[in-house]
UniProtKB/Swiss-Prot annotation:
Keywords of the record: Membrane, Transmembrane, Transmembrane helix
Family statement drawn from the similarity comment of this UniProt entry: Belongs to the TMEM183 family.
Any one annotated GO CC term: SCF ubiquitin ligase complex
Name of this chain's protein: Transmembrane protein 183
Localisation: Membrane
Region listing for Disordered, in residue ranges: 97-127
Natural source organism: Bos taurus (Bovine)
Membrane topology: Single-pass membrane protein
Membrane-spanning residues: 300-320
Amino acid sequence: MARGPGPLTRPRPDTVAMPKRGKRLKFRAQDACSGRVTVADYANSDPAVVRSGRVKKAVANAVQQEVKSLCGLEASQVPAVEALSGAGEPCDIIDSSGETDAQEESIHERTISRKKKSKRHREDLNGTGGEEYPMDIWLLLASYIRPEDIVNFSLICKNAWTVTCTAAFWTRLYRRHYTLDASLPLRLRPESMEKLHCLRACVIRSLYHMYEPFAARISKNPAIPESTPSTLKNSKCLLFWCRKIVGNRQEPMWEFNFKFKKQSPRLKSKCMGGLQPPIQYEDVHTNPDQDCCLLQVTTLNFIFIPIVMGMIFTLFTISVSTDMRHHRVRLVFQDYPVHGGQKLRSEQGVQVILDPVHSVRLFDWWHPQYPFSLRA
């Protein structure tokens, strides 16, 4: 018995094939530009209803591209808020490939132009740019430089620095500031300045006698008890001597002198190589007292001092004496320098205690009261 078409043989309606789990549908930019942007694509949508509460990157890029084609601007020039706000409106222009290609060509041309400009700039830097003036011109300009501006002048160029190394530069500087009424030691007088040996050091010392701005610096320096010198740390004691001072007091005072050599800045930075003067001017720049200073402590009576020459100065303290009228100075010397926050024990090293102390003074090598070296 033939059966007619029943409900089991009835044709089924066309079903839509669902994507497999774990795979995403391909995003087409034209879908976003045709008004298919939902509320779920925005950051202020309810995260309980929508899985993601942020704008999809593909949607944002497509909307910005469409706004760019409408406004004739680059995507980087359109704020993201304005681009997304305009995405909700229907797009009248769907095919804007011609305008996009033209804008891409203009962007490409600007990129090539910037690359050419940067290449030319690099060639100018690598090439010999600027003018190189003769040494005589720099020597002439150096005649108008103030003593406190010598460092800035020498940093202009190599020729300017070379001029500051010459004997002519330091001789002219001395003559420019010398006056007949200047009270100078014998080594700093004009007849002794004809020697090239240690000429630079002698001129600098003489400026602290004759040049008013330099002399004012010395008078403005505070007393040692008010500012404990920390620059002497890890300095090496080169020499020590004492002498009796006979003054207005009935009992004489004693002056203890410690000559230190400070740690070189190049050694601190572990950079041994530095800018050295030309060979023909080495005698002019010779200075036996370079980086040296003198610590002078005057006491009311004689105090026995142990041998500390050749040792490293690690600690300097000033406190009130037991009589509450004078100062008490404590010096600590070690066989090796102390680095970082390393702490010393009280029994380590050699301690020198001076009490009672009348005065404490610290002189750099250019100070007028600093004793001259016999080799200068």
